[in-house]
Amino acid sequence: MSSALYESSITSLPLLGRGKVRENYAVGDDKLLMVTTDRLSAFDVILGQPIPDKGRVLAQMSDFWFRKLRHIVPTHETGIAPEAVVQPGEADQVRGRAIVVKRLKPILVEAVVRGYLAGSGWKDYQATGKVCGVQLAPGLRNAEKLPEPIFTPAAKADVGEHDENISFDEVERRIGPELAAQIRDVSIRLYKEASDFAATRGIIIADTKFEFGLDENGTLTLMDEALTADSSRFWPADSYQVGTNPPSFDKQFVRDWLEAVRIDGQPWPKTAPAPQLPADIIEKTADKYREALTRLTGETLR
């Protein structure tokens, strides 16, 4: 395994902020250097141990999807090599895991698209017959494919806080009906096209989330990450079965361990600090991320 990067320390550029996984540095007034670390968050809590290669896998996966889907919506890419904007001694921190992007005005709505009933969506449906306020037919089962993908937005929370599911009406109220409809329609189109491609690779994309910003002309632009194992639930099609929790190529593996772990006989309350992950869980999770990259894109880690 390669060495892991838990936190970057690039002193040649002003640090703007550290998110759960990514760290942003200013490159002039109109660009950012976005570094994807090997940190992992689960249940909106940042875990204390890095997952080796995870950041590089996510960066390569995003790059693959940005190139594949840019005909649908502009992306934040600039094409500038990250090594070109840092000092030579800092190049190892950015190589393969960073991207120089346009500085956008972020839209504080997580654009979640669900094509299958899974995770919190399944729990919501069991309790209410709806997912995030979207009424669904009765009698659906866990992991069942929905007749059409649904848009279930969330309000973006601060680091350490839980994202809050909100209705489409609330999105319209916050950002206006025209932009809300554009984000919904673009998100569903991105999901459908990515799902169709993933199906040819033997992967089901159960759900995913996108983030958008506006450029200086007010143009909607895809930003942050796209269809990675962090922002999506990937299932191998060959072992998919309705009524079960399909095995997945994402951090669900860690989530399941955290759900099962007991601390002094009690479940972990899903607040910081997170329990220490065993070495085998870290290794298996790193393998899952690498496998997702290869299965989906046909590429190996660069």
From Swiss-Prot:
Domain of life of the native organism: Bacteria
Q: What is its EC number?
A: 6.3.2.6
- Gene3D superfamilies xrefs: ATP-grasp fold, B domain (3.30.470.20), Phosphorylase Kinase, domain 1 (3.30.200.20)
Q: In which pathway does it act?
A: Purine metabolism; IMP biosynthesis via de novo pathway; 5-amino-1-(5-phospho-D-ribosyl)imidazole-4-carboxamide from 5-amino-1-(5-phospho-D-ribosyl)imidazole-4-carboxylate: step 1/2
InterPro entries reported in the protein's UniProt record: SAICAR_synt/ADE2_N, SAICAR_synth, SAICAR_synthetase_CS
Keywords of this entry = ATP-binding, Ligase, Nucleotide-binding, Purine biosynthesis
Q: For this entry, list what GO says about its biological process.
A: 'de novo' IMP biosynthetic process
Q: Which GO cellular component terms, listed alphabetically, does the Swiss-Prot or TrEMBL entry include?
A: cytoplasm
What's its catalytic activity? 5-amino-1-(5-phospho-D-ribosyl)imidazole-4-carboxylate + L-aspartate + ATP = (2S)-2-[5-amino-1-(5-phospho-beta-D-ribosyl)imidazole-4-carboxamido]succinate + ADP + phosphate + 2 H(+)
Query: GO MF annotations for this entry?
Result: ATP binding; phosphoribosylaminoimidazolesuccinocarboxamide synthase activity
**Top EC category:** ligase
Q: Which PROSITE patterns match?
A: SAICAR_SYNTHETASE_1, SAICAR_SYNTHETASE_2
Name the PANTHER family for this protein: PHOSPHORIBOSYLAMINOIMIDAZOLE-SUCCINOCARBOXAMIDE SYNTHASE (PTHR43700:SF1)
Query: Which family is this protein grouped under?
Result: Belongs to the SAICAR synthetase family.
Q: What is this protein called?
A: Phosphoribosylaminoimidazole-succinocarboxamide synthase
Species per Swiss-Prot/TrEMBL record = Ralstonia nicotianae (strain ATCC BAA-1114 / GMI1000) (Ralstonia solanacearum)
Lineage of source species: Bacteria, Pseudomonadati, Pseudomonadota, Betaproteobacteria, Burkholderiales
Q: Which gene encodes it?
A: purC
